[in-house]
């Protein structure tokens, strides 16, 4: 059963081959047997899941129509609210915070009969690229337990990779879905800004954040987006970008022109570069032509991103003060102590580093030097993409400059920030992007191909990713030994 996609599991429930309850039991058995060595989940909600599964099974018994996600087990990144469950953001600051409402994506999942299994680990407040910045425990890469799974949605990627669930929700502020997807050999999709409601997502960078799915195959991304996408009265940034379904769009022809910023591929390892150009050959064999495009301005994207993201983070995290909710220091003896000690003790070092950076670039003395210049260059990055799309329909890039690296191998914060070089620009420019498995490094670790589209052209991005998946032969890949995680096959 672990090899089945979300769509296949849904169809098995509709046909009566499996029940939603049996599927939930099967995946909980996998989690309880093996997650102690991977650390993907922070908490489980078995009672809620079994209650929902029983409702789905009863609907089927009565002959009622079932939702698009009927019986599909889904993991949720722990910065997305689910009523009655803890939303910790993997931080001591919110260790005991219980969500008082459902995020819009959660409402849409449950309206379509999806089964929520639990909350997934992440870098604290989604700030990090390794999932080692969780306040509770690190997450390991199922392909090599000595390696990081990426971040900040590392728990989501690891859970899907280990087949603890066929689908998980993550959030992507600068690559936090796509990079861990590539590291863990799964599919990760960052929708266009405004395509999916952010209501109920704990904000990191409000002009950058986007909720998206991680899955084993591209078909499940399309399934998820047919549920998640659409305007929401609780999120004024949402738009109705799409008319037809994502699943129908997968069958369309690949675009004739695919842009590649050749000047932005410097510094890639030989095996990464070889894999990338081999991936382009797969697309060329389907009739696409590769054209060189000028995106040299993206060499400034990481700097701009960390100015903008840190400024927005400092503003968004100002609410966590030890007064209204969250951790409050027991050592405080004055109001100033409450503010200071609660934040120093409640936040981890990386979160405090970014708050300090954000307040620095927003300070009266530095705002014009850093923040205003950063936002001006962001506008130029958007213009550069618009000009590039005059020559092509979609853009192809690697997801990362390296495969998953060993835990502790990269400790310098600047070196970690530079891991985002191929992902942050899409958030700055509001663009959709998908990461699909493209092969393996010389160490045998997964690599990913990234396809980027114009804002609102999410369906085309998924279609190219699907076409690559089907013609490359790299589909639904599993870590060695994944089939040994749980021997039973529940019907």
Swiss-Prot record:
InterPro entries, A to Z: Amidase, Amidase_CS, Amidase_dom, AS_sf, GatA
Enzyme class: ligase
An example Gene Ontology CC term for this record: glutamyl-tRNA(Gln) amidotransferase complex
Active site positions, chain numbering: 77 (charge relay system), 152 (charge relay system), 176 (acyl-ester intermediate)
GO molecular function: ATP binding; glutaminyl-tRNA synthase (glutamine-hydrolyzing) activity
The entry's keywords: ATP-binding, Ligase, Nucleotide-binding, Protein biosynthesis
Matches recorded under Gene3D superfamilies: Amidase signature (AS) domain (3.90.1300.10)
One Pfam family here: Amidase
Entry annotated with the keyword Repeat: no
EC code(s) of this entry: 6.3.5.7
Known catalytic reactions: L-glutamyl-tRNA(Gln) + L-glutamine + ATP + H2O = L-glutaminyl-tRNA(Gln) + L-glutamate + ADP + phosphate + H(+)
Function: Allows the formation of correctly charged Gln-tRNA(Gln) through the transamidation of misacylated Glu-tRNA(Gln) in organisms which lack glutaminyl-tRNA synthetase. The reaction takes place in the presence of glutamine and ATP through an activated gamma-phospho-Glu-tRNA(Gln).
The protein's assembly and partners: Heterotrimer of A, B and C subunits.
Family under the similarity heading: Belongs to the amidase family. GatA subfamily.
Protein's UniProt name: Glutamyl-tRNA(Gln) amidotransferase subunit A
Organism: Chlamydia felis (strain Fe/C-56)
């Amino acid at each position: 059963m672990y090899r089945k996609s979300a769509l296949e599991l849904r169809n098995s429930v509709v046909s009566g081959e499996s029940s939603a309850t049996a599927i939930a039991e099967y995946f909980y058995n996998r989690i309880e047997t093996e997650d102690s060595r991977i650390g993907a989940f922070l908490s489980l909600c078995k009672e809620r899941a079994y209650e929902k599964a029983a409702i789905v099974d009863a609907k089927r018994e009565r002959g009622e129509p079932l939702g698009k996600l009927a019986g599909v087990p889904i993991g949720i990144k722990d910065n997305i609210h689910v009523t009655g469950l803890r939303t910790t953001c993997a931080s001591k600051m919110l260790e005991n915070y219980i969500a008082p409402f459902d995020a819009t994506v959660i409402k849409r999942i449950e309206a379509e009969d999806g089964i929520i299994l639990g909350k997934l680990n992440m870098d604290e407040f989604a700030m990090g690229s390794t999932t080692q910045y969780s306040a509770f425990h690190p997450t390991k890469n199922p392909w090599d337990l000595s390696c990081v799974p990426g971040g900040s949605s590392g728990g989501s990627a690891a859970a899907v990779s280990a087949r603890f669930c066929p689908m998980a929700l993550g959030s992507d502020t600068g690559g936090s879905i796509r990079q861990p997807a590539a590291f863990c050999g799964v599919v990760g999709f960052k929708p266009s800004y405004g395509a999916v409601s952010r209501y109920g997502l704990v904000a990191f960078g409000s002009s950058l954040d986007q909720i998206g799915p991680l899955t084993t195959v591209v078909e499940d991304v399309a399934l998820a987006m047919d549920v998640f996408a659409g305007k929401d009265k609780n999120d004024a940034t949402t738009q109705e970008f799409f008319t037809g379904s994502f699943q129908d769009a997968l069958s369309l022809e690949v675009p004739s022109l695919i842009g590649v910023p050749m000047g932005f591929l410097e510094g890639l390892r030989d095996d990464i570069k070889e894999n990338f150009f081999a991936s382009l050959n797969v697309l060329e064999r389907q009739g696409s032509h590769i054209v060189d495009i000028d995106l040299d301005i993206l060499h400034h994207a990481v700097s701009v991103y960390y100015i903008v993201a840190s400024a927005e983070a400092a503003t968004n995290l100002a609410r966590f003060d030890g007064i209204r909710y969250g951790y409050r220091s027991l050592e405080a003896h004055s109001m100033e102590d409450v503010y200071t000690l609660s934040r120093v003790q409640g936040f981890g070092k990386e979160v405090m580093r970014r708050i300090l950076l954000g307040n620095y670039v927003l300070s009266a003395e530095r705002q014009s030097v850093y923040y205003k210049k950063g936002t001006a260059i962001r506008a130029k990055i958007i213009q550069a993409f618009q000009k590039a799309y005059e020559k092509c329909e979609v853009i192809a890039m690697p997801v990362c400059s390296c495969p998953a690296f060993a835990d502790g191998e990269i400790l310098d914060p600047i070196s970690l920030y530079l891991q985002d070089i191929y992902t942050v620009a899409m958030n700055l420019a509001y663009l959709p992007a998908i990461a699909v498995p493209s092969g393996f490094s010389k160490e045998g670790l997964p690599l990913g191909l990234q396809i980027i589209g114009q804002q609102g052209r999410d369906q085309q991005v998924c279609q190219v990713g699907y076409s690559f998946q089907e013609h490359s032969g790299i589909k639904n890949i599993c870590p060695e030994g994944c089939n040994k995680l749980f021997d039973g096959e529940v019907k």
